[in-house]
C-alpha cells in the first residue's frame, strides 16, 4: 500500500489538468473536515490567507472541500453560505455536494473518485492552491509538488521504516511552527491508518506549558517537523526525534513530507497488523453527525 503515497507524482500530473474557477472575492473562507480539511491549513503555508471563520455575510467566497461530498459539517456551511448570498466553490468527487452544486448552479470542481480521502491529497490540494494563489497574485511552481515526491521517494521509504520503529508502542506528539499543518497531518495519518494514538502541538506555544507534561509522560515521544530556528529549542529540551525537510522549497516539502507521513503510518499499521482502510469508530461518528445536522 505504500505505493498509494509514493505514486502521488502521477496523481499530481492528473490534478494539474483539472479545470478551476475564478474566485470573486478577496475574503476567502475555507470549509473542510479531516483529510479534506487539512488541505486548507496546508495551503496557508504558501501564504494564501484562507479564513476558517465560517460566518457568512454574502461578501465572501466559500471554498468547500469534501472528497466524498457527504461531510455533514461542510454541507451545512455550503447551505449557510448560499442563504447569505456568498459565492460558493465546491471541490468534491460526488455525493450530496455535487448534487447541491448542480441544483443551485454553484461553481463545481469535480475530482476523480474511488480513493480514501487521505490518499487523494493531490486531487484536493492542487485545484485549491491554483485558484487561491491566482487570486492572491502569488507565484508558485506547482510542478514542484510533483517533483518533491519523485526526488525524495527513496529517502521517504527509508525514513518511514526508521520512524515507524521509533514510534510504535509509544505516543508520538508531533510539533512544528511554520509546518504545523504538516505536523497535524502526521498525527491524522497515524490515527487513521495505524489506529494508533498520536497528537500534535504548535511551537512556540508548547514551550510555555506542554513540555512540562513530559516529566510524568514516559510513554510520550516528541517528534519535530523542523521548519524554523525556534523548533530547535523544543528539540533540545525534549531530546526529540527530528524530521528534517528534504528541500528548501515549501512546495516540494509539502508533498514529500505528507507522503512521508502516509508511508510512516502504513508501516506502523503493518507492525500492528491493522488494515489501514478499516474504520472502527469514524462511521458511527459520521452517522451521529449526519443525524445532528439532519443531512440525508
Curated annotation (Swiss-Prot):
Residues in SIS domain copies: 12-143
GO molecular function: carbohydrate derivative binding; glucose-6-phosphate isomerase activity; mannose-6-phosphate isomerase activity
Species: Saccharolobus solfataricus (strain ATCC 35092 / DSM 1617 / JCM 11322 / P2)
Single biological process term from Gene Ontology: carbohydrate derivative metabolic process
Reactions catalysed according to its record: D-glucosamine 6-phosphate = D-galactosamine 6-phosphate
Protein name (database record): D-glucosamine-6-phosphate 4-epimerase
Enzyme Commission number, as recorded: 5.1.3.42
Keywords in alphabetical order: Isomerase
Database matches in InterPro entries: Glu6P/Mann6P_isomerase_C, SIS_dom_sf
Active-site residues, Swiss-Prot/TrEMBL: 192, 208, 286
Functional description taken from the UniProt entry: Involved in the synthesis of UDP-N-acetylgalactosamine (UDP-GalNAc). Catalyzes the conversion of glucosamine-6-phosphate (GlcN-6-P) to galactosamine-6-phosphate (GalN-6-P).
Family membership noted in the UniProt record: Belongs to the PGI/PMI family.
